[in-house]
């Protein structure tokens, strides 16, 4: 019978968990979390920010979770990289910022989260369905996915 052995609270909840690697030599598994909910209040979970212009925002990020096999109750977020940031400018909203696509089209929301992430460890790639964008990530270093 399955039994819960741990839990990790995230700022945007959890839609999909993707096992990226592991266990490694240290007995740890790396998981990416795709959160799609609104951001929790900081009073509910410390470190959750949603203030306009605050670069600490939980938007535009994917959580990297480390799970030690010898004690899964100690699983934790070890990084939350801003995977949508523009590499040249550093602007977090580096992809679609939302808006109208032209006459007789719909308005769409900004790209600030991934609905699903599928990983291909043998190729060091992950593919994300991210707010209407198909995105590839280099996961050569699973702790630091790069768009």
Where are these regions (language model features)?
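Feature marking well-ordered beta-strand scaffolds used for ligand recognition
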Residues: 1-147
């Amino acid at each position: 019978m399955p039994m819960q052995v741990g839990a990790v609270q995230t700022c945007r909840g959890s839609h999909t968990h993707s096992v990226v690697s592991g266990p490694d030599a240290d007995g740890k598994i790396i998981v990416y979390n795709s959160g799609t909910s609104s951001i929790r209040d900081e009073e509910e979970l410390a470190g959750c920010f949603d203030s306009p212009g605050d670069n600490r925002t939980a938007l535009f990020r994917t959580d990297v979770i480390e799970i030690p096999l010898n004690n899964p109750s100690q699983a934790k977020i070890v990084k939350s990289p801003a995977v949508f940031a523009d590499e040249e400018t550093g602007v977090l909203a580096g992809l679609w910022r939302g808006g109208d696509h032209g006459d007789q089209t719909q308005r769409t929301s900004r790209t600030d989260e991934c609905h699903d992430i599928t990983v291909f460890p043998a190729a060091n790639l992950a593919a994300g369905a991210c707010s209407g964008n198909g995105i590839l990530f280099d996961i050569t270093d699973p702790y630091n996915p790069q768009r």
